[in-house]
């Protein structure tokens, strides 16, 4: 086994030959990413030091860890006659996972940073061989990883922040499409596939793409972005809690159990999106709430009078009527189609 200080990603530059590049790419069930399955002897891939078992991290400077096999193949074919691949072998991949570092092109030149180095990003993706759980991501070689949002502080460089933001028609929200290697975004811990929750302390989940971009540009030379990776996003959605800066280092919401209201989850706020919440019997669709019975709150359960029973029956019939649609919401729904 190689010493940790000698481990580093490899940047392989391939020039296409008459028979192609000479390597085979495939995905592995249960593991995230694309892997080099075979390298042909005497091929450009072998000359570039590409090896079977390597995991592909970047293609021509773009992180592809969250992309499908087809998308990765198209990126390799996009530049005719040559390609540049950032890869990690199994040992390096495990070391990066153990230290919760994200692989970058800079590491191929400088090696892995010392453990005390301040530019190490905060924990992000779990290792590719990890198993999910309700409260965190359980790594086969270590303790469970807490699923938390990440607060990324970016200072604008000469080339900007170094990330690309996009919206996806198939799902609401704004997503990080790519992060430039060695950029302020990369050093802040921002990653491709992250979903943007807040910009400079303001929730932007309901804003349009142009509005989010304007918020990022509002402060000229810096931005503070609260983001969640796909696993953390799913976890918080299951709990029906909107991630906030408090969840970065503070108490995390607990899984919902019988008799527990989502609003009681360790101070977490309930997700405002109606599509994420099942109907509640205690809340009317028009936003009003049931009046509390002071006797019941004190522990006394009294039988209703005839008048009370009649009033309750009338209220139940009223509440079964279909709610009036908010016209702003209606336009939103239509625009999504």
From Swiss-Prot:
UniProt-annotated location(s): Endomembrane system; Nucleus; Apical cell membrane
Record InterPro entries: EBP50_C, NHER, NHERF-1/NHERF-2, PDZ, PDZ_sf
Bias (Polar residues) ranges: 255-275
A GO MF term: phosphatase binding
Region described as Disordered: spans on this chain: 112-145, 242-337
Sequence positions bearing Phosphoserine: 130, 183, 186, 254, 269, 280, 303
Matching PROSITE patterns: PDZ
GO cellular component: apical plasma membrane; cytoplasm; endomembrane system; nucleus; stereocilium; stereocilium bundle
SMART domains from the UniProt entry: PDZ
Keyword Membrane: yes
Comp. bias (Basic and acidic residues): 327-337
An example Gene Ontology biological process: phosphatidylinositol 3-kinase/protein kinase B signal transduction
Keyword line: Cell membrane, Membrane, Nucleus, Phosphoprotein, Repeat
Membrane recorded as keyword: yes
PDZ domain segment(s): 11-91, 151-231
Coiled coil region boundaries: none
Pfam family, one: PDZ
Topology in the lipid bilayer: Peripheral membrane protein
Known partners and oligomeric status: Homodimer, and heterodimer with NHERF1. Binds PDZK1. Interacts with SRY. Binds ADRB2, SLC9A3, P2RY1, P2YR2, RDX and LPAR2. Interacts with MCC. Found in a complex with EZR, PODXL and NHERF2. Interacts (via the PDZ domains) with PODXL (via the C-terminal PDZ-binding motif DTHL); interaction is detected in glomerular epithelium cells. Interacts with SGK1 and KCNJ1/ROMK1. Interacts (via the PDZ domains) with SLC26A6.
Role description: Scaffold protein that connects plasma membrane proteins with members of the ezrin/moesin/radixin family and thereby helps to link them to the actin cytoskeleton and to regulate their surface expression. Necessary for cAMP-mediated phosphorylation and inhibition of SLC9A3. May also act as scaffold protein in the nucleus.
Name of the protein: Na(+)/H(+) exchange regulatory cofactor NHE-RF2
Organism: Mus musculus (Mouse)
Gene, per the UniProt record: Nherf2
